[in-house]
Amino acid sequence: MDHHVADIEQLREHLGIDRWIVFGLSWGSVLGATYAERHPDRVRALVLGAFSTGSAADIDWITVHAGRFFPAEWRRFRDHVPAELRDLRLVDAYNILLMDPDPAVQEAAAIEWCRWEDAHVATTPDAAPNPRYDDARFRLAFARQVTHCWRNNSWLDDDEIVRNADRLAGIPGSIIHGRLDLSSPLDAPWRLHQAWPGSELVIVDDEGHGGQAMMHRWRQVLADLA
């Protein structure tokens, strides 16, 4: 995480921006919140969408416990892991498969990882697979990046973002979250809102991990802050 935050700060300096509005969606909200807590003097406002803490508990929720909502899809996801890796966390096992020297092993693991990604964000009957996963190069790169990050618990101490939320005091901002988000349950943004003085929690009742109504709210909030 230190390197990710340093990259953002280097970009800000390169662009000659003194203070800016930081926006993060999904894992980008983990990065955006962490950046704001470490460089609060450089953040004019902070907008987070589909927030999670990036902690081990949240990662285990997505890779294990969310399977209670999608049992058939999760069983397929889990069963792709060979017996000799079953004692590992699923995210660790998949990272090993994705880095296997055999391209066929890598590709099969990437397909199953992205299939599960599609499953746990599908909260409506008309949910469609993410078309980006049709690209084999993107699919493998995405799965590798996600598992590398998650197996390291986003390089954050447990619940670090919520515990350090007092550093966000004085920074105006909004947390926009779908009530039906099964990937990132509402308790994480609610706890951050409680710990972040002056923040606004916007709950979109009929959407999950993104959607048209949430995008509309994001645009509204960003326009109001600009």
Question: What residue spans do the PLM features occupy?
Answer:
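Active-site nucleophile elbow and catalytic-triad environment of alpha/beta-hydrolase enzymes
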Residues: H148-A165
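Conserved acidic catalytic loop of the alpha/beta-hydrolase fold
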Residues: D2-W20
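Catalytic active-site module of serine/aspartate enzymes centered on a nucleophile-bearing elbow/loop
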Residues: R163, S199-A226
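Short beta-strand/loop motif that positions the catalytic acidic residue
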Residues: L168-A169, I175-H177
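A catalytic-pocket lid/entrance helix-loop region that shapes and gates access to the active site
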Residues: D41-I96, H148
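Conserved alpha/beta-hydrolase "acid-adjacent" motif
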Residues: D157, L182-A188
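Short beta-strand immediately N-terminal to the catalytic nucleophile in serine-hydrolase-like folds
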Residues: V22-G24, G49, I176
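Short glycine-enriched nucleophile-adjacent loop
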Residues: S29-P40, L46
